[in-house]
Amino acid sequence: MADSNASTEETPCGSIVVIENVFHYKQIIPLQMGDNVIGRHQKGNPINTAFETVDPSVDLNHCTINVSRDKQGRLKYILRDNNSNTGTFVENVEIPPRERRVIESGTLFTIGGTSIILKGPDEED
């Protein structure tokens, strides 16, 4: 039997895993469909994918992962830098300004001194 609330429930879209370092503890942050703005958590900062860190090289609004579905219904992840001060790197290659990079589950990307791994919805940490 179909649940009338099914359309309002969130579909798992994967997560980002912030790897522990001297600036912060390990954090797992769920992603949602659409733009997921990633950056340093600060009270009053309205971004939707913030993590707690004291890393000064992570901007408050550092980068964005857009989650959508392709024509086959598979999740698609597109990463872009938000004109950050230190850049966004995918496997040690900087994403140039105004460019986007398609990434997939297991991709390692770096913002400031912080390494992050994209995980698909069916993967465990």
Language-model region placement:
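Intrinsically disordered, low-complexity acidic Ser/Thr-rich regulatory segments
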Residues: 1-56, 66-76, 120-125
